[in-house]
Amino acid sequence: DGRCIVWAPNQGADFVAELAAKISGVPVTAVEVRTPYLGGGFGRRFYTHHYLAQAVELARKHAGRTVKVLWSREEDMQHDHYRPMTMARYRAALGADGLPVALHITNVGDGPDRHSFPESIPKSNLDESVIEGAQKQPYAIPHRRVDYVYEPSRAPLGYWRSVGHSVNAFFKESFLDEMAHAAGRDPVEYRIALLKSEPRFRNVLETAAKQAGWRGKKWKAADGKDHAMGVALHLSFGSIVAEVAEVSAGAGGKPVVHKVWCAVDCGFAVNPLLVSMQVESAIAYGLSAALHEEVIIEDGRTSSSNFSDYPVLSAAEMPDVDVAIVNSGEPMGGIGEVATPPIAPAVCNAMFALTGDRIRSLPIKTAAT
């Protein structure tokens, strides 16, 4: 009858309608998208709708009949659009007080913007999704430079919860911690010294440190093991988040995360319970990726196929999370993704305080990788 009806979880009904219209041959105004509240998205259902394309193509060939397409977990994991692999080099010049006077960042990689919206890439070849979170941060560093080197990915790329912020917070906050230790200064105090003209950021950081009862040195805990804390601060999607993680060393030197304290300023929390739930979820998501998640590609194909060879964070590994909401009254920012970026650097910085070994890649395989 000249219509196309699509039932599918998605993160952009307009994108689904445009795709369905293109494949089915009906006008986009004749496409109806019905979105069930089913499962999560986290970027997977934003623009990578090849499973929908299959369903619409089959429906076109069998007009008048309802077609259902269901992928197995193995099919889904092996035909995903993946989080981009990214590398970075950070260099800094420190002044007599140990604070940075110049910072040079070089990011190397490919990004989801180029794969999903190639028309958005300017003639300069800059993919903003690769460097977001590397610039526009609050620290008072007089001279900064951010370079981007495009290294094309042969694997299909997609959006991942917090997108470029997820990697750039790890790079940036790990390096801030490294500079603090090189200067012989406490990591929290060092950041505060760089935030003298940023009271909103400073308040969030101080709130998280106070929550945690910040300790800059490792200590012997009640379980008889050495424990240590690490901190990270990051701005993303209009919201400021500071996180402190408490860790000890487990089997093989991998971190055991006992507790996370998080302070978040998203402007004003209309629904504080929902904000806390999103923060806890985002921390679990980021921690799972930091500790475990790795897609293995062998002989040109994805070999990871199920949770047996793609482990995720277990309930037993999930730390207690203490959330403090800072209502600054500033314009409201996002909340669904903003607590993901700081968790990996907070944990890795804590491991440095514990072991003296700097973790430089994710996921964490040993105490120093």
Model regions: which residues?
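Cofactor-binding beta-sheet edge motifs in enzyme active sites
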Residues: 1-369
